[in-house]
Amino acid sequence: MAAQRVAMRNIKECLRLKFEGGLSHEKIARALQLSKGVVSKYVTAAAETGMEWPALAVLDEVALAAALLPTARVRQTRGERVLPDLITIHRELRRKGVTLQLLWEEYVAAHPEQPTYRYTQFVEHYRRYASTLKRSMRQQHRAGEKLFIDYAGPTLPVIDPATGEISRAHIFVAALGASNYTYACATPGETQVDWLTALGQAFSYFGGVSEMVVPDNPRALIAHPDRYEPGLNRAALECARHYDTVMLPARPRKPQDKAKAEVAVQVVERWIMRVRHQQFFSLHALNQAIAKLLEDLNQRPFKKLDGCRREWFERLDQPVLRPLPQHPYEVVTFKRCKVNIDYHIEVNGGFYSVPSALARQSVDVRLSAHTVEVLHGNRRVASHLRLQRRGAYSTQSEHMPASHKAHREWTPQRLLDWGERIGPQTRQIVEHQLTHKPHPEMGYRACLGLLSLARQYGNARLEAAASRAVQLRALNGRTVRNLLKQGLDQQPLPKPATPAAQPSSHENVRGADYYTQEELFDDDPTHPEPIAPTAAGRHGPSTGRTMDAAGQPQPELR
């Protein structure tokens, strides 16, 4: 079967869709009606030229065909040719903008009097050298371009000195693509806060920011998993925006996308796990031990390359890293809230005001350790300091409608004075409302609702209803309002219950004062003789009988 013939304009369009559009081979093939094999063939041919896409894009069809489709390969003689410095070439290719074409030209210029290899043989020698390295080392990462991050599998124990409880610390690993310069730290877990906090610490350790960050596909950072374009959650996007970088998660189950991170994790597991037999009583102590091991790791010489991680970092990545922002990223969380009718939202037990026009609408809340920001339509509409007490209110006057601003000007004394002008019973209810509501704002509203009844019913009726409410011991505005609605304030107050009838005066009836006399409790034998009762009881002595000193009746003489 004859090979598929492709017009040069389609080849050029194929390369544009690949290098500018970033489309997959399958999508390009479908768009241009080509096979995936043909697309791969020309993309590979373009890569083999050593030229970047902008250089290929300016070529006409004839020049592009000459670059991509050489009609014959010139055989090279096996004379004494100068062998290029392959280790230096491998290192230099990590610099941004450096290509094999440029390095070949420099190689030829450096040996003007000696026979050198043609470009194709130059590339062939380098590829043979690169094939002796590990696969992950063959990937070309530009200096300062990518930072790979991941978590190591094993965890380390941390003992609580107070309770003896053991928690497991997770090891975060970050490695720069060009130099393999590595950072690691221990975190309490692998939550969103842990990922983003550790990433900020890694940037601080490197002293700069890479162009891209390549994480795995952690749930803590991914909102919408996808094989080709996984969607980051809002916190991860904000973190990337703060550091002026791009976060590009690797594809699920595609370890080759983050081979640098996989290798770094393996190195860290073998190097830092030397502390696994030590006991640590805080995360800080564990991170101090990890920091010491990191210095040794980054200064250890490479096995197949010259130098060490630190030397390569100082030579390649460090000069081209982007500057750090003035302040590190403060990790935030987002939640969706609905504004209550009183133009407040509830966040973790606290109540925060928003513009009153947003009542009953949904807003986004950006919650940090110290602030609460409210967003509507991606625009910040309110900002509050975070409340530390549950049930507390944070209300800003500019969020209140005009009528509520007037209400806010009321003070407890002003409300009490208004109630006093209506009547003492009304003032008593106002005072009760101010002191028995859980929040002062609630007390103000209740008092204003009570006092506003005077406009509808008049001061006299309000005071009468307040008097009846006080008598009923129902000191609240609802009771007063119901009394006014039913007209009960215009009925006379019920008379207080009359006390029970007192017994008639009698010489044997003693009052309360009698039992407080000290003489009743005096054991002095000079106590006066008791007076015989004038009336005989059922079993008592008869009338006219005298009593002896002991109080006993004397025998009657007949």
From Swiss-Prot:
Positions of the UniProt region annotated as Disordered: 486-558
Span of domain Integrase catalytic: 139-336
DNA-binding region(s), chain positions: 23-44
Pfam family, one: Mu-transpos_C_2
Keyword Heme: no
UniProt-recorded Gene Ontology molecular function terms: DNA binding
SUPFAM superfamilies hit by this protein: Ribonuclease H-like
Ranges for domain HTH IS408-type: 11-93
InterPro entries the record matches: HTH_IS408/IS1162_type, Integrase_cat-core, IstA-like_C, RNaseH-like_sf, RNaseH_sf
Residue pairs linked by disulfide bridges in the UniProt entry: none
GO biological process: DNA integration; DNA recombination; transposition
Keywords: DNA recombination, DNA-binding, Transposable element, Transposition
PANTHER family: TRANSPOSASE RV3428C-RELATED
Family stated for the protein in its record: Belongs to the transposase IS21/IS408/IS1162 family.
Role: Required for the transposition of the insertion element.
Record's protein name: Putative transposase for insertion sequence IS1162
Species: Pseudomonas fluorescens
Lineage, uppermost ranks: Bacteria, Pseudomonadati, Pseudomonadota, Gammaproteobacteria, Pseudomonadales
